[in-house]
Amino acid sequence: MKIGITGASGFIGKRLVKKLEEDGFEVFKFVRRDVQNENEIFWSPSKQEIDIEKFQTLDAIIHLAGESLAPKDIFGFLPLSGGRWNKEKKSRIYWSRKWGSDLFVKTYNESDIYPKIFITASGTTIYGDHGDEVITESTTKFNRGTFDQLVAEEAWESPLSGIKHKDVRIVKARNCLLYTSDAADDDHC
């Protein structure tokens, strides 16, 4: 099975690539720079460009790409990347997700050959605060109008309803923030 992954160099992506390769999957990394080997696929979400020929060879896509949510450590001893969530940071968080989702919808709709599985990252914040209640896919989404909920709903998930091909299985992997204590990891969040 050929799987394309956006965000392959990120916190989740690099671990997922390693595991998928160990399990025998053929992994292709979407990159925004010049392609350096046969297992890379060029894409530019901000310019709405993608190598459609390589896209059409994939069986599945896992879409993880987006601006890091992690704050910078203002004290200088936590190796986190990112920055405070000021207006500019929020814009990068939102648009880095929205452009990618929009590009995939456009590419699917312009293609007669396409991956039949599309897995997108999203956030558990889409549900709002339910206290101690166990959250499932059927849990009511609270519309709090907060930025984190806006990103999950409008940037990650809603655009995907525009994919016209009804035989594409769309999976929404709603994650919370993840951390590691691995000191060798340069991206702790």
Tell me what each language-model feature is.
Residues 3-21:
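N-terminal Rossmann NAD(P)H-binding glycine-rich loop of SDR-like oxidoreductase domains
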Residues 30-34:
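N-terminal Rossmann-fold cofactor-binding loop
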Residues 45-103:
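NAD(P)H-binding glycine-rich loop region in Rossmannoid oxidoreductase-like domains
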Residues 117, 122, 158-181:
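Conserved beta-loop-beta element that borders a ligand/cofactor-binding pocket
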Residues 37-47:
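Rossmann-fold cofactor-recognition segment
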Residues 66-67, 124, 186:
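Flexible cofactor-recognition loop at the NAD(P)H-binding site
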Residues 88-91, 95, 101-145:
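Conserved Rossmann-fold NAD(P)-dependent oxidoreductase catalytic core, especially the SDR/UDP-sugar
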Residues 179-189:
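Single conserved hydrophobic/aromatic residue that forms the stacking wall/gate
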